[in-house]
């Protein structure tokens, strides 16, 4: 999942990096094929070039290796709100058929079963980035018919990729997600059964390329570097 998400990034793109799997995927892309990808963190790090996997958006390695550090106000007003982010890399606890995301709460907001980390900058990133990549594990608990809380609105222009451990989803012309590719060894019915709505299939279903040994080695080294 992380490797397939990393493959979505292109060299030279300005990428705003979320926490968790998006963080690993973006840094992996820089190691593999996009060394000139500009990593931006909402804490204010511009052009971060961390030598290890950052533990959070406040990791001191980001400050030490960034080309520039800006205030949170400048980050949200100039960089995100100003449309200067090519790709927003996000995670989600829940996602619906229109790629709306929930990172706030599971269950009623007033008395949730689980209180999630919250919005952070995700709503602004989802609304203002030129494209959005979402990483999530594929299960009926995550891919739901109705979100418990709408944190971030789906990217209605269609420039969205949802990368899961089973395949790749992208919006059709009407904005509804459809399965466009499955990973090696995965059958389309597996993906449909792991989705909380009647998932559409693209007319010509593709298969993602197998993961290479080089990609796996780089990912293992990146994960092993965390916290050093």
Ranges and model annotations:
Residues 9, 13, 29, 33, ...:
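Structural signal for hydrophobic packing residues in well-ordered secondary-structure cores
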Residues 27-31, 47, 51, 101-102, ...:
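Charge-rich, low-complexity amphipathic helices
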């Amino acid at each position: 999942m992380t490797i397939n998400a990393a493959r979505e990034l292109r060299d030279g793109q300005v990428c705003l990096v979320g926490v968790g799997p998006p963080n690993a995927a973006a840094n992996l892309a820089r190691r593999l094929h996009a060394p000139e990808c500009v990593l931006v963190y909402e804490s204010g790090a511009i052009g971060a070039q961390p030598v290890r996997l950052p533990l959070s958006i406040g990791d001191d390695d980001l400050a030490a290796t960034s080309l520039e550090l800006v205030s949170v106000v400048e980050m949200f007003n100039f960089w995100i709100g100003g449309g200067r982010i090519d790709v927003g890399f996000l995670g989600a606890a829940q996602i619906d058929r229109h790629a709306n995301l929930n990172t706030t709460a599971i269950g009623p907001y007033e008395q949730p079963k689980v209180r999630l980390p919250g919005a952070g900058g995700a709503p602004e990133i989802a609304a203002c980035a030129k494209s959005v990549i979402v990483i999530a594990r594929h299960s009926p608990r995550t891919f739901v018919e109705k979100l418990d809380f709408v944190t971030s609105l789906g990217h209605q222009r269609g420039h969205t990729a949802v990368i899961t451990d089973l395949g790749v989803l992208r919006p059709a012309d009407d904005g509804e997600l459809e399965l466009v590719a499955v990973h090696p060894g995965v059958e389309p019915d597996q993906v449909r059964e792991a989705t909380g709505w009647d998932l559409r299939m693209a007319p010509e279903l593709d298969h993602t390329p197998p993961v290479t040994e080089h990609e796996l080695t780089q990912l293992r080294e990146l994960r092993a570097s965390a916290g050093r």
